[in-house]
């Protein structure tokens, strides 16, 4: 599956946007496709987080579970994440936050693969489209939360 790239401009300062993006435990409160996010491990300085996620795929009446490791860089305003284990065959990516004065650009790049045995190309295409929608919806949800 190709890389999913998405970007959004948020009407809010970078400190506020970055802080909300780091608060992954709160995501299920405002992202309906997420059932839960639980922190399993956090480094003393908070730069490394291992978390368990449960997502909901309504179209297929199923849930996806995965554990990921996030490496946050406060200075560069980035997060690099990768799959530890879970339902995905491949899951990795990065988030970058760019200061635009009173606005922030949030760039997301994710490489994700979800192999379903005996599923045809049409269904895989639907899954790829759904994953792109989920990334876009996540960025929109963070934008909505920051802009209030």
Which ranges hold each PLM region?
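Short loop segments at secondary-structure junctions
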Residues: 12-14, 75-76, 100-102
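Glycine-rich portal/gate segments that line the openings of hydrophobic small-molecule binding cavities
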Residues: 39-84, 137-148
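Intrinsic-disorder/low-complexity, polar/charged segments enriched in Ser/Thr/Lys/Arg/Asp/Glu/Gln
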Residues: 3-7, 48-50, 65-67, 78, ...
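Hydrophobic/aromatic beta-strand elements that line small-molecule binding cavities or substrate pockets
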Residues: 6-8, 37-39, 55, 65-72, ...
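Amphipathic alpha-helical hairpins
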Residues: 2, 8, 30-38, 43, ...
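Beta-strand/loop substructures that line and gate deep hydrophobic ligand-binding cavities in soluble
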Residues: 82-129, 133
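Hydrophobic ligand-binding cavity/cleft-lining segments
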Residues: 1-48, 105-107
